[in-house]
From Swiss-Prot:
Protein name: Putative RING finger protein ORF97
Organism: Ostreid herpesvirus 1 (isolate France) (OsHV-1)
InterPro entries documented for this protein: Znf_RING, Znf_RING/FYVE/PHD
Entry keywords, A to Z: Metal-binding, Repeat, Zinc, Zinc-finger
Lineage: superkingdom: Viruses
Signal peptide extent: none
Length: 181
């Protein structure tokens, strides 16, 4: 017989100290003592990242500039969200660039220079650029590297690939939506 330990409402779920004052995260979970609340970056229950726990980062990844238009000035917008936060700036840039060319085409109504953009042949799953042959989706025009395609589309065996595109979540039948590019 296995024993089940019932966690009381005054028990910290991170260090298991009992009869302590618990702090509430932005997500609404009341689960950590003061020491764990200051130490643990995300909510232990749902992994939600509270806004006040976003720490400034000194590293901002190099993002290629778009050839035919200029993106929104991220510095002005991030100062309003969180002062001195280059991490918020980095997240905002990655969100815009991570959407890929189809998102930017819809946002800016621009199709010129699409193939010359730096992210044109980046895998939408692992976000790395490879010199290998990329596979292009016919549904959402996103690219997959060989490793991600083999892992995602043949995970359950060649007879049962994923029933949806992992980038746009549209349903499809088999491998007919991907083509070598």
């Amino acid at each position: 017989m296995s024993t089940v330990k019932i966690i009381s409402e005054e028990m910290c779920v991170a260090c298991f100290d009992e009869n302590v004052k618990l702090y509430i995260y932005d997500c609404g979970h009341k689960c950590c003592c003061k020491e764990c609340f200051e130490r643990v970056e995300r909510c232990p229950m749902c992994r939600h990242l509270p806004v006040e726990n976003i720490k400034p980062s000194t590293h901002v990844p190099a993002i290629p500039s778009a050839p035919s238009f200029e993106l929104i000035n991220m510095e002005v917008e991030t100062r309003e969200i969180h002062p001195r936060s280059s991490r918020a700036k980095s997240i905002a840039k990655r969100m815009v660039y991570g959407m890929g060319p189809s998102f930017l085409d819809k946002l800016f109504d621009c199709k010129s220079g699409r193939d010359s953009m730096a992210w044109g042949k980046m895998c939408c799953i692992c976000t790395k650029k490879t010199n290998d042959e990329m596979i292009k989706s016919k549904i959402c025009e996103s690219y997959y590297c060989r490793d991600c395609r083999d892992y995602l589309f043949q995970e359950n065996g060649a007879d049962q690939p994923l029933p949806f595109c992992p980038c746009c979540f549209k349903k499809y039948n088999g491998f007919e939506h991907v083509s070598a590019h």
